[in-house]
Amino acid sequence: MRFGRLLLLAVLLAGVSQLPAVSGRKKGEKPGGCPPDDGPCLLSVPDQCTDDSQCPSTMKCCPRACFRQCIPRVSVKLGSCPVDQLHCLSPTKHLCHQDSNCSGKKRCCPTACGRDCRDPVKE
């Protein structure tokens, strides 16, 4: 009887391990996000990676101006940045560079004139 229970437990655990991750990440995608890239494409070079699995431990495969590259990941807060419907008349400097620069739940979001800390919208 005890062997039967152990076998049932093993089968259940094996099945659960095959379920997709609840986090919504794609298979092989590492946690965290990519830092923003503001640079223009100065030199077109081949992609250095196609996905996170090709990057060392804490690095992610991130899009740059005109190619993909393994770079250190940054922490990303929950929610999405709101869409900015405005047009910029006078560009300003960025008020943040990544989510960790923003207080509380605010995210560092692109706006018409630069990056700024904004309240996220629910996904």
From Swiss-Prot:
One of its GO terms (molecular function) is serine-type endopeptidase inhibitor activity. One of its GO terms (cellular component) is extracellular region. The keyword Oxidoreductase does not apply. Residues 1-24 form the signal peptide. Its main location: secreted. The keyword Glycoprotein does not apply. It comes from the Eukaryota. PROSITE patterns: WAP (PS51390). Disulfide bonds join C34-C62, C41-C66, C49-C61, C55-C70, C81-C109, C88-C113, C96-C108, C102-C117. Residues 27-74, 75-121 form the WAP domain. It is found in: Secreted. Pfam families: WAP. InterPro entries: Elafin-like_sf, WAP_dom. SMART domains: WAP. SUPFAM superfamilies: Elafin-like (SSF57256). Keywords: Disulfide bond, Protease inhibitor, Repeat, Secreted, Serine protease inhibitor, Signal. Putative acid-stable proteinase inhibitor. This is WAP four-disulfide core domain protein 5. The gene is WFDC5.
